[in-house]
Amino acid sequence: MRAVVQRVKRASVAVDGNAVGEIDKGLCILLGVANDDTEEDANYLCEKIVNLRIFEDETSKFNLSLKDIDGEVLVVSNFTVMGDARKGRRPNFMFAADKEKAERLYNYFVERLKGLAKKVECGIFQAHMEVEIVNDGPVTILLDSKKVF
C-alpha cells in the first residue's frame, strides 16, 4: 500500500462538480493499493500517518503529528500511485490491486483512520475526481507499507 501524504492548509474533493469531502488544516492522502496488500498494510500506514511528525512546533521544528494538532484528513483513492514508470514511457499498473480488493482495503483504511483522527473525509472510489489542495510548506512525504523507499 502506498500513500502520498501532503500537509495542507485545506483540501477538497469533488465529483461531477459537487463537493464530496473537504478539510481544513491536516493531511491530504492519495492512496494506492497493491495486489499483495492486506489489512496489516493498511494498519501500518494508518499508524504511521497519524503519528508522523511533519507539523511545526513553536520553534518551527517538525515535532508535531496529526494527532498532536488535532488535524483533519482527506483520503483520495488513486491507483496511479502504484504505477511503475522505470521502463518505457507509459506507467505499468500491474502491481495495483484489482477493483474489488482495492475498494475493500481502501474502505478498511478509511474506517481505521476514522478511529485515529479527528475528522476524516474521502473521495468516491473509482470516480473521476477533482482534488483541490492548498499545500502548507509544501511538505510531501511518500510512504509504502512494504518500505520500498
From Swiss-Prot:
InterPro entries tied to this protein: Daa-tRNA_deacyls_DTD (IPR003732), DTD-like_sf (IPR023509)
Keywords annotated in UniProt: Cytoplasm, Hydrolase, RNA-binding, tRNA-binding
Cellular compartment(s): Cytoplasm
EC number(s) from the headed UniProt entry: 3.1.1.96
Biological process per Gene Ontology, one example term: D-amino acid catabolic process
Hydrolase listed as a keyword: yes
Extent of motif Gly-cisPro motif, important for rejection of L-amino acids: 137-138
One Pfam assignment: Tyr_Deacylase
Catalysed reaction equations from the record: glycyl-tRNA(Ala) + H2O = tRNA(Ala) + glycine + H(+); a D-aminoacyl-tRNA + H2O = a tRNA + a D-alpha-amino acid + H(+)
UniProt GO molecular function: D-tyrosyl-tRNA(Tyr) deacylase activity; Gly-tRNA(Ala) deacylase activity; Ser(Gly)-tRNA(Ala) hydrolase activity; tRNA binding
This protein's GO CC annotations: cytoplasm
Main location: cytoplasm
EC class of the enzyme, as a word: hydrolase
UniProt comment concerning the protein's domains: A Gly-cisPro motif from one monomer fits into the active site of the other monomer to allow specific chiral rejection of L-amino acids.
Subunit annotation: Homodimer.
NCBIfam families: D-aminoacyl-tRNA deacylase (TIGR00256)
Sequence similarity: Belongs to the DTD family.
Known role: An aminoacyl-tRNA editing enzyme that deacylates mischarged D-aminoacyl-tRNAs. Also deacylates mischarged glycyl-tRNA(Ala), protecting cells against glycine mischarging by AlaRS. Acts via tRNA-based rather than protein-based catalysis; rejects L-amino acids rather than detecting D-amino acids in the active site. By recycling D-aminoacyl-tRNA to D-amino acids and free tRNA molecules, this enzyme counteracts the toxicity associated with the formation of D-aminoacyl-tRNA entities in vivo and helps enforce protein L-homochirality.
HAMAP family according to UniProt: Deacylase_Dtd
Name of the protein: D-aminoacyl-tRNA deacylase
The organism's taxonomic lineage, starting at the top: Bacteria, Bacillati, Bacillota, Bacillota incertae sedis, Caldicellulosiruptorales
